[in-house]
Amino acid sequence: MDTFECLSCGPLASRDPYSPFCPGCGEPLFIASAACPGGRRIHEDKALAIAKFADFLPLEHIDPALSLGEGMTPLVPLGRVGRALGLAEIYGKNEAQNPTWSFKDRGTAVAVQKAVSLGTQRIGTVSTGNMAASTAAYGARAGLETFVLLKEGSSAASLQAAAIFGPRLVAVEGDYGALFEASLGIGKRLGITFMNSIDPYRMEGYKVTAFEIFLQLGRRAPRSVIVPLSSGGHLLGLMRGFADLEREGLIQTYPQIVGVQAEGCAPLAQAFDKGLAKYERIAPGRTIAHAIANPTPPAGNAVLRMMRERDGLLLAVSDEDMLEAQRELASSEGLFCQPESATTLAALKRLRDAGRLRAGEGSVVLILTGSGLKTLHLLASAPLEIHHFAIDGLEAGLARLSKRA
């Protein structure tokens, strides 16, 4: 049986299986680190990503039939971006290669494996987009009745991406934070396991990204990892992954973790700048980065604590900077990611300009969390440069356009 811990209160004797929060202080719960045995190793001969790292996950058995082939996403060298910034080792971890085109599949895969092992029949999630599609897909794969709650007014693309998998799809009026809280009580009364953003098993799944980066860099840790930040569960999962590697003696230097928010909704970056231990709820401003616009991040205080303990960094970038970074990643490196993902490159530029990153200091990994194909509507008003030629003038026209003509 798994044991749990709270960063503030310590180990718990028992836990409400329908709540991810500590009953004492209301902060998120984690799988207890002290309960993990030493001598864990990576099984590189295994095909499935979660099987490779099974020693580090709270799963007694992994059913391959529940997997959609998530994980082992490419770590792509960003040579042109690096040269433009005067930085040698820049990589993009392309999470768009996961089954539903985002990093969420890593957490969902582990959470669903656990749910099935416990005999769960009903699962659900509260989401603004990526997690809706992911939970619906894995619920369909496992044959579970799946409930997806989205905030009223969610984009048609978000609704359609989840609806194709056949879940009980519900649009709910009201505040997203209130919906998150309400889902937990409703789930307990109706027997629905809501595997929301800070579900402890979901966060365990996010550790696998850290393990993959370690292998893909030749069994070493990067100097820095830059990751978009919303609820905090993804970032904390990554941090726990590197902590596991450190605990097993597989890495000697813990990477600097940089969390990035949108300036229009940056409660954690603002709290970090002020040196606060707890974030202050804010009224969300306007931003195109809806997937990371969370004014009440449920793991926010845990993120602030871990940033202090691990010398991490939080910052916010503008919509203009993230859109410019999105275009640069696409045109320079062939990687089309969501604007939220491109916050990582925008943050990298900010750190370079401030002298916080210099050439020769080690590798930097940008976590590109999702595909730009999920947010095509944001490009609808972007100008298109299209050249028009008649067939008899095509060759001459192409010659004029060619950089090598």
Language model features with spans:
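PLP-dependent amino-acid enzyme catalytic core
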Residues: 1-405
